[in-house]
């Protein structure tokens, strides 16, 4: 085996814990794409061919013992080789804390370790208008979701057939993306070339609407209804709570991608639990890394 080739080990699934792969590979591209925000691309044919929109990986820097645990990062993009075969994945992160500070100093050729794909994926039921709502770094899982929904690309071809994404299930995909200032907006060119329409809000008015991303969502929800609608949301918890309330007000299904801190990513440590309302009206703790990170918005105990 070429010493620069990824090393991959597949972990056996059980009734309680999912199948995932441990991959030791190298960074092929690492660049800053917004203020305090980086996009890292790593080579892995297996992860690129199996991962669905909304799923994530635990990431570690090889040989780094401080911090020891990995960091959960969602797939931002999937890349193909010259033959059109999935060959690499990208993650996006903001520099916040010791791990991401060290990670941001890594360069192409440095070794990293990933295990995944982890968690569930966004629903793929046919819909006329899919509205993506992202705040902060919450845009990360939205690019592949938009691509899959519009049928521009399929994902998870090597995953079990029941889990792979269908070839297009939305007629229109809108992105509502909010940030503090325009300097924090990441991946805009990719979203503008993928989504049907992109709507921007910045708190200081430096780009797009001056205000909150929920203002943009309200405007879209007030458009004359043309068929079915669904919302997918990721970002700070107060924003997702507000989006959940709007979805309820407009009787629109909404899925949220939770960003709870986690240590293992495979359901063992229970550090990522969230309060989820059960069918009987009571709540119970659910692991974001196993039962999530995607949940129906109305099932989350926001208070």
Region spans (language model):
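N-terminal acidic, proline/glycine-rich, low-complexity intrinsically disordered segments
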Residues: 1-6
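Ferredoxin-reductase
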Residues: 9-108, 179-180
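Short, charged beta-turn/beta-strand-edge "cap" motif at the junction between a beta-strand
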Residues: 62-66, 116-121, 278
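FNR/FR-type flavoprotein reductase catalytic core
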Residues: 98-261
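Local cysteine-cluster metal-coordination motifs and their immediate loop/turn environment
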Residues: 141, 237-238, 260-294
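A charged, well-structured terminal subsegment
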Residues: 295-303
């Amino acid at each position: 085996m070429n010493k620069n080739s990824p090393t991959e080990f597949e972990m056996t699934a059980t009734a309680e814990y999912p199948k995932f792969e441990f991959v030791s590979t190298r960074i092929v591209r690492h660049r800053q794409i917004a203020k305090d925000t980086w996009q890292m691309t790593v080579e892995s044919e297996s992860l690129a061919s199996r991962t669905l929109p909304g799923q994530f990986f635990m990431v570690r820097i090889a040989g780094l013992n401080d911090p020891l645990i990995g960091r959960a990062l969602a797939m931002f993009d999937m890349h193909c080789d010259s033959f059109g075969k999935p060959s690499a994945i990208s993650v996006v992160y903001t520099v916040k804390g010791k791990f991401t500070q060290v990670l941001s100093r890594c360069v192409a050729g440095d070794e990293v370790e990933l295990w995944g794909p982890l968690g569930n994926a966004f629903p793929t039921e046919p819909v006329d208008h899919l509205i993506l709502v992202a705040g902060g770094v919450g845009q990360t899982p939205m690019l592949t979701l938009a691509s899959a929904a519009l049928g521009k690309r399929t994902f998870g071809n090597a995953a079990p057939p029941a889990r792979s994404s269908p070839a297009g299930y939305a007629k229109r995909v809108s992105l509502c993306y909010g940030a503090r200032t325009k300097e924090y907006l990441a991946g805009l060119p990719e979203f503008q070339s993928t989504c049907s329409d992109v709507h921007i809000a910045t708190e200081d008015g430096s780009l797009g609407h001056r205000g909150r991303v929920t203002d943009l969502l309200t405007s879209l929800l007030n458009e004359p209804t043309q068929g079915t609608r669904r919302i997918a949301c990721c970002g700070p918890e107060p924003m997702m709570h507000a989006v959940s309330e709007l979805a309820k007000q407009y009787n629109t299904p909404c899925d949220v991608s939770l960003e709870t801190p986690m240590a293992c990513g495979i359901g063992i440590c229970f550090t990522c639990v969230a309060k989820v309302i059960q069918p009987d009206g009571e709540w119970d703790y659910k692991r974001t890394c196993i039962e999530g990170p995607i949940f129906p918005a109305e099932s989350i105990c926001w208070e």
